[in-house]
Amino acid sequence: MNITGIITEYNPLHKGHIYHINKTKELTSCDGIVCIMSGNFVQRGIPAIMDKWTRCELALNSGVDLVIELPSVYSLSSAEFFAYGSISLLNSIGIINNICFGSESGNIDDIKSIAKILNNEPSEFKNHLKDYLDKGVSYPVARSKALVEYFNDNLETQEILKSSNNILGIEYCKSLLKLKSTIIPYTIQRKGSNYNDDKLESKFSSATAIRSHVKNSKNINILKDILPSKTFNYLYDKFNNNNLVFEDSMFSFIKYKSLTLKNKLENLPDVKEGLHNKIYSELKNSNSFYELVSNIKSKRYAYTRISRILCQYFIGMENFNLEYLRTKKSPYGRVLGFNDTGRKILKEMKKKSSIPIYMKLPKTLNDTLKLDIQSTYAYSMINKSVSYDSDFKTSPIYLK
């Protein structure tokens, strides 16, 4: 079988995602699609608007054949570790021929050439990177500027490095090189809104714009013509039953934890240079998640980095060796759902995978899996439709 992997969050699944699925099938001529999907928390450092089982079902109804959960140790990390965890998982299951991702560029050769520089790190690039870091800018900004210098201020490189999905695509390709993978990368140019756009568009609205509208509106009927019907129906039902969650859902718990439990925020690997003191200080004076992050962010610490730190703290990741875990290849593949084609893929995967494939949780839990379970515990505190023990009780979805 010719199998293509895609890496997703579906927060929530929209028409742009369906376009990606259909174009992936067309571009790679694949017999099936395996989707690596973030669980209940996503890379921006926020809880998913709908739980992972609901989003898995939507994916299966939209043309995906098999959904595997991306462990939270990767899904709540920077683009580099998010990509590495995802690619290592696709590589380890042993049956993936291609990956296909969306990008603003749409040019796989440009993306691969930048990935090669980041993987090899020639001395000229490293010197530029050090110079910018010494000026106090954040690592992502310093890296982008160093790349532009390396490519002699190439305007095309500057444009590529401005966009979130291009950066993720570069990290995917870099991880393929790092792992010496035989998986072939493809990219599809994104249509409609950019990843960070917060305004609705009639055809391809971004997930950011959709979440923003749902969060700030009393009526979401306008989304009926923008979203796939199944996504809208799920959202509408959960909206009316107050079962949707946003970053502010975590705020009171984070504030209480910081004031009473005194867990060590500084144990998280992205908390450096006394940042924990700034966070503790601003927590006392902030009244919302957005206000808190806005008060902390700086030239050195981007909004999403602060958001991820707070989300990790909410879950309790400071009690694990996150710095070690996120640099290692994914140690297992946990199946969330599949259809008939996915069933055939699973059969092949179990023969060829170099890591265990879990349909249900094993008796012995490694730290990466413990963190996934702890993430569900935390998510159940802010989403009343999710049971704290759902990881133990929920079987993979089988869409016939």
Swiss-Prot record:
Parts forming coiled coils: none
List the source organism: Clostridium novyi (strain NT)
NCBIfam families linked to this entry: PRK13670.1
Which PANTHER family does its entry note? TRNA(MET) CYTIDINE ACETATE LIGASE (PTHR37825:SF1)
Q: Which GO terms describe its cellular component?
A: cytoplasm
Q: Name one GO biological process term.
A: tRNA modification
Q: Which cell locations does it reside in? A: Cytoplasm
Write one Pfam family the protein is assigned to: HIGH_NTase1
Q: Name the enzyme's class.
A: ligase
Q: Protein name, please? A: tRNA(Met) cytidine acetate ligase
Could you say which EC number(s) this protein's record lists? 6.3.4.-
Q: Which reaction does it catalyse?
A: cytidine(34) in elongator tRNA(Met) + acetate + ATP = N(4)-acetylcytidine(34) in elongator tRNA(Met) + AMP + diphosphate
User: What InterPro entries does its record include?
Assistant: Rossmann-like_a/b/a_fold, tRNA(Met)_cyd_acetate_ligase
Q: Which residues does the record give as ATP binding sites?
A: 7-20, 102, 165, 190
**Main subcellular localization, coarse class?**
cytoplasm
The molecular function terms in GO held by this entry are: ATP binding; ligase activity, forming carbon-nitrogen bonds; tRNA binding
Q: What does this protein do?
A: Catalyzes the formation of N(4)-acetylcytidine (ac(4)C) at the wobble position of elongator tRNA(Met), using acetate and ATP as substrates. First activates an acetate ion to form acetyladenylate (Ac-AMP) and then transfers the acetyl group to tRNA to form ac(4)C34.
Q: Which family does it belong to?
A: Belongs to the TmcAL family.
The coding gene here is tmcAL
Q: Which UniProt keywords apply?
A: ATP-binding, Cytoplasm, Ligase, Nucleotide-binding, RNA-binding, tRNA processing, tRNA-binding
- Please name the HAMAP family in this protein's record: TmcAL (MF_01539)
> From which domain of life does this come?
Bacteria
